[in-house]
């Protein structure tokens, strides 16, 4: 019963999504992951494995983007089950029961089944973990964390081939999930765990502890090798992208004040109920100017008191100290830019400089709290009248300390919340003044608005916190001293119910759902798709959001009928086509969410949003953007095709054949070796991109020379990994200019002859053709994928060798035993 309880409870917050009618939608789910999911699922079911996405960012590599999870077996399987809506919801949901099972396996190696179930539920249902559901790469990676710890604990106890294989497989799955911060944290955690926990470490056997670390490191390295099919392409793409230089690494740092929300959820604002950050003045002050990455960091008073009882009690000292240290390190690193510690690590320790969003380290704190809760529950199980667990004075002191802490903590929280709420009601003027001063200290210009907002919300939110805190105080006062078995069992039942119910109530709204009808293809895209080679542009869509301040943006956005808050924002994200691939609509200025696209693309995109309207128009004309979503004031006297839903003043306009076509023959070339100079030219006047192509080097003409024809080019076959173009060239050589992103992994043949692809106009591909008619084939053959696959194959063979070796060893042992 206990092993099944944890995964079943972890599913409860996600039950609304286990249908084919409603979709999980919060933030990145509706903006990016829904589109990625649909595009990949439809491609897979059609028999294609797309390595290149030809629709976003003028075409970009898909295999190297770990957010697609193209090589993570359970995620692939989940996305192919049932209909499109159910498959997506399963992709979002399944990490949490997986995390619960892994946590139970890990804890059950040291604690009772009941205590392990409490710990597993605490991990899988607490706010920080449930909040990862809006980013499947993060949630799948976090789900494997307890499995990696379970494998490490087995290796530390007995470094058999089976245990090494379990740990290697866990690390491989986490590596394939596509979240580098969690992977790095897990690797550090398991190595330190191997060095400090276990019989060898406890007996001060330095050689034995060293062997444990080496075994753990070897298994982890094998897991990384198995995942090289994803890791190597991602690393290669990172080296060519803006991520290799300077990226924003302090975003989504956790201000220490925000830790109050571990016991008082949404004290500083509820993102799901707001139309904009202006409605919740405290939220941007505490989360580096935006909404939080983790929408909840709630543990609750009962769970934290239970964890405090376990970590301060009589359990294994190394275990307790390890998780206290891990939890504190997770908290401090989550603070990011708000302490001098993380900036120092970011600037001087290489891996940290490549990671974004320090708040992700908070998942380690969640694991530490769950470990403490497991130990605390087992400590309560031992507190029964007639059982003497205080065999010496030191144990008695520890137990007394744990009892006082578990009682004093919830009492202090409940009293503090009660006093603060009373001050807001009965001493509103001086309290408002103090709150305004505090808000100004955090960066608010005036502070009065933030103070008034807090006074309004505290009055209605404080009562549940006070009630839960005082009930927890009473239960710990009852349970932390020896009682008769019946009283102890009944009290633990009440406490367990309180802990689980508190977590479930607070987790229920973290991953809301929305009617699937709002996720249908935007109707306005039907005009764009009428010309499959044309691209579109949505004015105001920049840096992953819609800006009313952008010169091309709508000056306002309205709620979808019947929707408000985050639900309306999700519907707006679909209308803005943040990820248009499933609808086969082409875009150039797509937001690069993982920061993995080539630097030339990011240079172009960054400059575009800083340019004048005239320079923007030149760029759009030269990059094949025929359809543009703009306010009427930015479209001149053009007649709009259709109004865009939820956009206050934007329409879809057709700029006709004035833009450069996707494929064309350009008669003249000019060598410009610097890529940045080529990109800059796209914005500048005095250059006809249809008559002159800028190439990075001269390449020889290719193709069977024939009779000169009127220059033309047209695409006759087009898929993700292959494009076939028919072209004709006049009496002089000419360049076939293909307005899809340049990559060294594309190969070209002309009439069956190998051709050299030049980088053209900074972003595109170009092939020089001889006079006459030609068939030009472009094939995508990424070398990084081949290298990664070869390494993965070697790793898989090593893993199979370990399994077979272990099987043979057990078979021989059985033969010896039976004889």
Give the predicted meaning of each segment.
Residues 1-727, 733-741, 814-819:
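Conserved luminal/periplasmic juxtamembrane motif of membrane-embedded glycan-processing enzymes
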């Amino acid at each position: 019963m206990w092993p099944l309880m944890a995964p079943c409870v972890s599913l409860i917050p996600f039950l609304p999504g286990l249908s084919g009618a409603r979709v999980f939608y919060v933030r990145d789910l509706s903006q990016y992951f829904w589109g990625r999911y649909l595009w990949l699922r439809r491609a897979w079911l059609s028999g294609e494995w797309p390595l290149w996405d030809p629709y976003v960012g003028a075409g970009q590599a898909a295999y190297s983007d770990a957010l697609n999870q193209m090589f993570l077996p359970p995620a692939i399987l989940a996305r192919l089950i049932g209909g499109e809506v159910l498959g997506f919801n399963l992709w979002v949901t399944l990490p949490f029961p997986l995390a619960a099972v892994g946590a139970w396996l890990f804890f059950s190696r040291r604690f009772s089944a009941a205590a392990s179930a409490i710990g597993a539920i605490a991990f899988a249902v607490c706010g920080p973990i449930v909040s990862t559901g809006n980013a499947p790469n993060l949630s799948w990676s976090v789900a494997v964390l307890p499995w990696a710890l379970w494998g490490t604990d087995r290796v530390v106890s007995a470094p058999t081939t089976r245990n090494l294989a379990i740990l290697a497989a866990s690390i491989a799955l986490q590596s394939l999930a596509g979240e580098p911060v969690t992977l790095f944290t897990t690797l550090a955690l398991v190595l330190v765990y191997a060095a400090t926990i276990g019989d060898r470490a406890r007996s001060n056997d330095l050689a034995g502890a060293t062997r444990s670390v080496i075994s753990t490191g070897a298994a982890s390295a094998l897991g990384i090798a198995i995942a090289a099919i994803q890791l190597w392409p991602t690393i290669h793409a990172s080296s060519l992208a803006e991520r290799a230089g300077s990226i924003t690494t302090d975003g989504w740092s956790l201000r220490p004040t925000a830790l109050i929300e571990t016991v008082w959820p949404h004290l500083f604002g509820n993102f799901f109920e707001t139309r904009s950050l202006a409605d919740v003045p405290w939220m941007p002050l505490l989360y580096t100017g935006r909404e939080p990455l983790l929408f909840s960091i709630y543990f609750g008073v009962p769970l934290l008191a239970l964890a405090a009882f376990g970590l301060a009690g009589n359990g294994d000292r190394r275990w307790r100290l390890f998780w206290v240290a891990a939890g504190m390190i997770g908290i401090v690193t989550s603070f990011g830019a708000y302490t001098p510690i993380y900036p120092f690590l970011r600037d001087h320790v290489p891996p940290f400089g490549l990671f974004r969003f320090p708040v992700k380290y908070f998942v380690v704190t969640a694991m530490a709290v769950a470990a403490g809760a497991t130990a605390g529950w087992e400590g309560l199980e031992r507190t029964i009248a007639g059982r003497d667990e205080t065999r010496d004075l030191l144990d008695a002191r520890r137990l007394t300390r744990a009892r006082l802490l578990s009682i004093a903590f919830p009492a202090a929280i409940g009293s503090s919340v009660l006093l603060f709420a009373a001050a807001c009601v009965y001493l509103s003027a001086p309290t408002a003044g103090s709150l305004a001063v505090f808000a100004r200290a955090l960066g608010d210009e005036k502070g009065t608005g933030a103070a008034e907002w807090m006074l309004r919300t505290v009055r209605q939110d404080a009562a549940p916190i006070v009630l839960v805190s005082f009930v927890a105080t009473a239960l710990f006062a009852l349970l932390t001293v020896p009682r008769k078995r019946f009283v102890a069992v009944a009290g633990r039942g009440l406490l367990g119910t309180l802990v689980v119910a508190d977590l479930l109530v607070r987790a229920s709204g973290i991953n809301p759902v929305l009617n699937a009808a709002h996720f249908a293809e935007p109707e306005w895209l039907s005009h764009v798709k009428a010309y499959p080679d044309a691209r579109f542009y949505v004015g105001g869509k920049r840096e992953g959001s819609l800006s009313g301040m952008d010169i091309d943006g709508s000056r306002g956005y309205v709620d979808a009928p019947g929707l408000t808050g985050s639900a309306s924002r999700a519907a707006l994200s679909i209308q803005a086509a943040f990820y248009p691939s499933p609808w086969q609509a082409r875009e150039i200025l797509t937001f690069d969410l993982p920061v993995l696209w080539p630097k030339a693309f990011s240079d172009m995109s960054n400059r575009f949003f800083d340019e004048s309207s005239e320079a923007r128009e030149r760029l759009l004309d030269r990059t094949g953007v025929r359809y543009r979503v703009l306010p009427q004031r930015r479209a001149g006297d053009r007649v709009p095709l259709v109004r865009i839903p939820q956009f206050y003043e934007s329409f879809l306009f057709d700029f006709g054949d004035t833009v450069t076509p996707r494929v064309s023959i350009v008669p003249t070339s000019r060598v410009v070796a610097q890529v940045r100079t080529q990109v800059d030219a796209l914005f500048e006047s005095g250059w006809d991109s249809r008559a002159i192509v800028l190439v990075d080097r001269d390449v020889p003409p290719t193709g069977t020379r024939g009779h000169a024809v009127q220059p033309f080019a047209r695409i006759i076959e087009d898929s993700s990994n292959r494009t076939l173009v028919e072209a004709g060239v006049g009496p002089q050589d000419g360049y076939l200019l293909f307005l899809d992103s340049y990559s060294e992994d594309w190969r070209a043949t002309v009439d069956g002859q190998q051709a050299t692809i030049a980088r053209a106009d900074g972003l595109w591909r170009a092939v020089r053709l001889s006079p006459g008619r030609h068939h030009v084939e472009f094939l995508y053959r990424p070398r990084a994928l081949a290298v990664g696959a070869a390494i993965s194959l070697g790793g898989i063979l090593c893993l199979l060798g370990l399994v077979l070796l272990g099987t043979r060893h057990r078979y021989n042992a059985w033969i010896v035993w039976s004889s």
